[in-house]
Amino acid sequence: MTLVFTGGRFLLPEGVRTGLALVVRDGRIDAIIPEADAPEGLRVDAGGQFVSPGFIDMHVHGGWGHDFLDGTVEAYLEPARQHALHGTTTMAPSLATASYPDYERAVRAYREALPLNVSGARFAGIHFEGPFFSAAKAGAQDAALLKLPLPENYLPLLEAYPEIVRISAAPEVEGAMGLGEELQRRGIIAAVAHTDASCAVCEEAFRHGYSLMTHFYCAMSTVSKRGYSRYAGAVEAGYLQDFDIEVIADGVHLPDDLLRMVYRLKGPDRVVLCTDSIRATGLPDGEYIQGSLENGLKFIVENGVALRPDRGGLAGSVATTDRLVRTMARAIAGSAGLAAGIPDAVRMMTATPARILGLPAKGRLAPGCDADIILFDDTVAVSRVFIGGKEI
């Protein structure tokens, strides 16, 4: 079947364009042509809305009562379905620090869910957020389960789970540089996270294969003072080196001025938005479990903010990707109005994560790309979602 999208503001790599027809055949974008030349087919009239590539979430733990570490098929399928309704068409399920048996159950469920995932955001491999972190920056992770990134700890994971596309680790812990080199050799993303490292150590990590900073600013060292001297941390290394930067643009983790600074200093081609969304996403305030239901840690949600039980820090987010784009667009546009910031905010939610994940057919409206297409208005209220040319 041929789909023909018309009447929209098309978010193309070269900018926002109107008066076009986007033609979809066999699940892929076949052509983008003047609307007057549109072929016969099922028309999708955007009615003046934005026509955008589907959003790509590189860092998401679940939602709607499920955590991927629950180790069930439904723990993957239901969040995939629900996140898709908010514009996410591709996601990399993320596993927080856990026991190795919990990892085994979670990956087995991922494999079982893959062929069944026909109505949700497509899976793009697994992100291990842990267990190779600094205890000083464990945050909402289970510090009792942290391990050193030594070959005897990471090789069993890499050899058993070819689905791994990214591992987040603290570069200052013993063995981290070797882990970075091994991940780079295997084509797996090595990311700096939950770290108390100095700027110098993070710059060394960059030379040893680390290319991404996980939830920038969060559980991450920055300028500190010892005696009368000041020392730069991981945040400063993120600016000084060509790291890609991941931010949780939910309006809670980072204020607008920091979002603007990240955007201006790194640019939309180096910044990726992520939800870091957890089990409580889509649910009311209350008490929940982070990680597997059997072995996870308790956390609370108050006024839509996920917190550790002592309320001393955040515990992930309950955001969806449409909220990220809306928040970032508003932050970077300022007085120009939210809609003015949408093109670059969308780039940070589409083309940039597609490049980082190595998905050349995702994240762009261009001939040959997958027909993962969403429609939304000037407030980023998503109205229609197509994955592989099929509406969900």
Please identify what each model-predicted range represents.
Residues H61, L77-A106, A121-S134, Y161-E172, ...:
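Divalent metal-dependent hydrolysis catalytic cores, especially in the metallo-beta-lactamase
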Residues V107-E129, A136-A197:
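Metal-dependent enolase-superfamily TIM-barrel catalytic cores that perform enediolate-based chemistry
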Residues G48, F128, L183, M213, ...:
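Conserved, mostly hydrophobic/aromatic
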Residues E159-D285:
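Active-site core of metal-dependent hydrolases
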Residues R230-E246, Y263-T275, T281-C369, I373-F376:
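His/Asp/Glu-enriched, well-ordered alpha-helical/loop segment
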Residues M1-A38, F386:
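N-terminal metal-binding scaffold of metallo-dependent hydrolase/deaminase domains
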Residues R81-A92, A135-Y161, E204-D244, P284-V318:
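Active-site gating loops and adjacent loop-to-helix segments of metal-dependent hydrolytic enzymes
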